[in-house]
Swiss-Prot record:
PANTHER family registered for this protein in UniProt: NADH DEHYDROGENASE
Gene name tied to this protein: nuoN
Keywords on record: Cell inner membrane, Cell membrane, Membrane, NAD, Quinone, Translocase, Transmembrane, Transmembrane helix, Transport, Ubiquinone
Protein name, as recorded: NADH-quinone oxidoreductase subunit N
Source organism of the structure: Maricaulis maris (strain MCS10)
Lineage: Bacteria, Pseudomonadati, Pseudomonadota, Alphaproteobacteria, Maricaulales
UniProt subcellular location: Cell inner membrane
Length: 480
């Protein structure tokens, strides 16, 4: 490899290099710089590092191309995804800082693990090879396993981390087995070579391998029936970790799944569409009905996440330009709702500690009108109620399904959305019409304003929704 080639390859991976180098620097800074303010300094530097990586993906990387023997690709999809992942991870880190201080968990390892996880996510959305894909997934997963059990004094957190690790190892095994089958029958791990092998004729080995790969990736997006870990991990993990789990990793995994299906296996849509179709329906059903009986708001958000990944898979099943841009718009709007909802949950702290029951939201509109209005708007948006930005996210997904002649899937998506609205409205009812004697202590300024801004964004984003759709449409147009 010549110096020019190496320079070209590295220039396409500037965001990953910024994060990887930054993680090592933060680790050394935390070890060698002793003092009371070291943890807070590392946390603030992490926020800046994540934002810098997002901006680097948006502005610094010029052009598009392949890197390192076509193992990684930087295209419009990678640019869009890395920007979104970096920004939402920075916001999640801002949410975590007051919590870590209050719970005496302000160790330097937390921000370093977040940076390493985001590095893996950015590798995932740029993967153009099965080995590169697996490297990104494992870098992300190994960091997330530790984050889930970060509060070692909590039995629930330790249990969550263990469950996540065991089931994650199982999903990695499925993914590796599928990848080995694909490699064996295609003769290559590169997406381009796999696409040529797929186009040359039907091969049952490639199809079986793809099914295993889909199962492994379905675990990463917590799609049914590979969702078993989600409610327990969401409930047991520290709340800011749950907020992180619900946003950036889901975005990275669903984009990777879409890339794998639409690029190397784009010629055999009819062979994998039915699998995605079934997983989407199961996810929407499990999420909608599972959430109806939940009393813990973090478990409810877990089922909400499962359901929303079902809607995202509806867009993937469309396997079209419309499906791809609808997927990106839906996921961005979902992340706005999810991060705002968890900011509100983090604002509900009494003198004894965090509260997590839905009943604890009672009377929130009277005790704290700002948070009450924000949570109401966020629930309406995630539920897809009309005139909120979340409604348009679901509308575009269903439109993509209709355009792809998936009429039954579109109808089921509408029906499950109606069922899902019930548990979002239940939360709104508790906020506005129930009463409670619980007194919350004032929340951190950053947490409070993230909740407020996210709530306002569910309405204020409507004027810029056209710009977001245009950007996502440009990505779909360039790729398919």
């Amino acid at each position: 490899m010549t110096a020019d080639m190496l320079s070209h390859d590295l220039s396409l991976l500037i965001p990953e290099l910024v994060l990887a180098g930054g993680a090592m620097a933060l680790l050394m800074l935390g070890v060698f710089l002793k003092g009371d303010g070291t943890e807070k300094l590392v946390q603030w530097l992490t926020v800046g590092l994540l934002a810098a990586a997002a901006l680097a993906a948006l502005f610094l990387v010029s052009g598009e191309g392949m890197a390192f023997n076509d193992s990684f690709v930087f295209d419009s999809l990678a640019r869009f995804s890395k920007t979104a992942i970096g920004l939402v991870a920075a916001i999640a880190m801002l949410l975590a800082m007051p919590y870590l201080q209050a719970e005496k968990l302000g160790k330097i390892e937390y921000p370093v693990l977040v940076v390493l996880a985001v590095t893996g996510m950015m590798m995932m959305v740029s993967a153009n090879d099965l080995i590169a894909m697996y490297m990104g997934i494992e870098l992300q997963s190994l960091a997330l396993y530790v984050l889930a059990a970060f509060n070692r004094d909590s039995l629930r957190a330790s249990e969550a981390g263990l469950k996540y690790f065991v089931l994650g190892a199982l999903s990695s095994g499925l993914l590796l087995y599928g990848a080995s089958l694909v490699y064996g029958f295609a003769g290559s791990t590169g997406f381009g070579d796999i696409a040529l092998a797929v186009e040359s004729g039907s091969n049952i080995g490639l199809t079986v391998g793809l099914v295993f790969v889909i199962c492994g990736l379905a675990f990463k997006v917590s799609a049914a029936p590979f969702h078993m870990w989600t409610p327990d991990v969401y409930e047991g993990a520290p709340t800011p970790v749950t907020a992180f789990f619900a946003t950036a990793p889901k975005f990275a995994a669903i984009v990777l799944l879409a890339r794998v299906l639409m690029e190397p296996f784009g010629a055999v849509v009819d062979q994998w569409r039915d699998v995605i179709w079934m997983i989407a329906v199961l996810s929407m059903a499990v999420g909608a009905f599972g959430a109806l009986t939940q009393q813990n708001i973090k478990r409810l958000m877990a089922y909400s996440s499962i359901s929303n990944m079902g809607y995202a898979l509806v867009a993937v099943a469309a396997a079209s330009q419309t499906g791809l841009w609808a997927l990106l718009v839906f996921m961005v709007l979902y992340m706005v709702g999810a991060i705002g909802s968890f900011a509100t949950i983090l604002s509900m702290r009494t003198r004894e500690g965090m509260v997590e029951q839905i009943s604890d939201l009672a009377g929130l509109a009277q005790r704290n009108p700002g948070l009450g209005w924000s949570m109401t708007a966020l629930m309406f948006s995630i539920g897809g109620l009309p005139f909120m930005v979340g409604f348009f996210g679901k509308f575009f997904v269903i439109y993509a399904a209709v355009q792809a002649d998936l009429m039954i899937l579109a109808v089921l998506a509408v029906l499950f959305s109606v069922v899902g609205a019930a548990y979002y409205l239940r939360i709104v009812k508790v906020i506005w019409f129930d009463s409670s004697e619980i007194e919350f202590v004032p929340s951190a300024v950053s947490t409070y304003w993230i909740a407020r801004i996210a709530g306002l964004a569910t309405v204020l984003l409507l004027p810029v929704l056209g710009w977001l759709v245009f950007r996502a449409y440009s990505v779909g147009l360039a790729l398919l």
